[in-house]
Amino acid sequence: MSRQINAATPSSSRRHRLSLSRRRINFTTSPEAQPSSSSRSQPSSSSRSHRRQERRQEQRVSEENVQIIGNVNEPLTRTYHRQGVTYYVHGQVNISNDDPLLSQEDDVILINSENVDRERFPDITAQQYQDNIASETAAQRALQRGLDLEAQLMNEIAPRSPTYSPSYSPNYVIPQSPDLFASPQSPQPQQQQQQQSEPEEEVEVSCNICFTTFKDTKNVNSSFVTSIHCNHAVCFKCYVKIIMDNSVYKCFCSATSSDCRVYNKHGYVEFMPINVTRNQDSIKQHWRELLENNTVNNHTTDLNYVEQLQKELSELRAKTSQVEHKMTMLNSDYIMLKHKHAVAELDLQKANYDLQESTKKSEELQSTVNNLQEQLRKQVAESQAKFSEFERSNSDLVSKLQTVMSRR
């Protein structure tokens, strides 16, 4: 059944939403009604079975004590409990000041030994009765969450039309837990100031599947996703790989679902994969677009470029070391050749000196030979003169001898 609520001004509606978000149910026990630990007794098996039957009956009755405020086709924004009736508010509803549900006082249930129903619970204490009421309230909320999950699974199993799109489907309602009191509005200024005052801390977290380390800002963003049925996180890369291989994500805790949640500082987003297409060229096209349009101020690209330059620098340093080694060897050869050249110059100077000495000696010998030849020529001339003179003397003597002989 739906309930009509009188309209109010925007300022009053915001004030009333804040008052609703602060509503709670407090269970208090009077001091005289609290028994000591020694006086508590364990209930018998018959009382436990009786309580289970009563709990099932109250669970069936609790389904009738539910009132819905607003349009049921809109998402559930808040829920609260008052005087045995659970109220579910759907969508943005302005509640007037005259509504009795807007009492600023909390719903306090005082439980003592006098107001416990002894006919239904003859052997139960006030504390156990209070725990039973809290358990029944938690069971009702768990039942509502189960119904929401069943509705979501039925929507997934139901056949879809070719034009189905979850982003624009008017019948797709995101299930929310009745325990969530916060509306999908922007955070209040006090919350924003508190978030701004918190220091940002970068934390390195690793994936339990691929062991890749990511650096995220604590309580601000996250590179991990979780299933809608558990809180075990994996990186988005591993989630996509599992969905690509199996079409369904199964956690190591046996929770199976294809939907996942992505978190940031404002909340989380639930999404589910619609279509899985296996095409190896799509990632290449995607990377071409990334390299063309998304690498202008990319720190990773700069790091890759710096790494490439460092590699080139290392290669150039190695080549420079080789050139320096060759230069050292050439300098050594040059010094050795220089020493050889100096030795050759010394040898040449010595040879030149020896040549000069030999030339000088040769000139002296030539002079001596010339002198000897001159002396020999003079001696030959003298000898020829003497021989001529001897020949004349001999001729004269022969002629004289012939003359003497002829006279005889």
Curated annotation (Swiss-Prot):
Biased composition (Polar residues): 1-10
A GO-annotated cellular component: host cell nucleus
Region (2 X 8 AA tandem repeats of Q-P-S-S-S-S-R-S): 34-49
One GO process term, biological-process aspect: symbiont-mediated perturbation of host ubiquitin-like protein modification
Zinc finger (RING-type): 207-255
Compositional bias (Low complexity): 30-47, 183-197
Reactions it catalyzes: S-ubiquitinyl-[E2 ubiquitin-conjugating enzyme]-L-cysteine + [acceptor protein]-L-lysine = [E2 ubiquitin-conjugating enzyme]-L-cysteine + N(6)-ubiquitinyl-[acceptor protein]-L-lysine
Keyword annotations from UniProtKB, A to Z: Activator, DNA-binding, Early protein, Host nucleus, Host-virus interaction, Metal-binding, Modulation of host ubiquitin pathway by viral E3 ligase, Modulation of host ubiquitin pathway by virus, Repeat, Transcription, Transcription regulation, Transferase, Ubl conjugation, Ubl conjugation pathway, Zinc, Zinc-finger
Keyword Ligase part of the UniProt annotation: no
The enzyme's E.C. designation: 2.3.2.27
Location of the region described as Disordered in the Swiss-Prot/TrEMBL record: 1-67, 176-199
Main location: host cell
Sequence repeat residue numbers: 34-41, 42-49, 51-54, 55-58
Reported modifications of this chain: Auto-ubiquitinated.
Skewed-composition ranges (Basic residues): 13-25
Subcellular location: Host nucleus
Family according to the record: Belongs to the alphabaculovirus IE2 protein family.
Assembly mode: Homooligomer.
The name this protein goes by in its record: E3 ubiquitin-protein ligase IE2
Organism: Autographa californica nuclear polyhedrosis virus (AcMNPV)
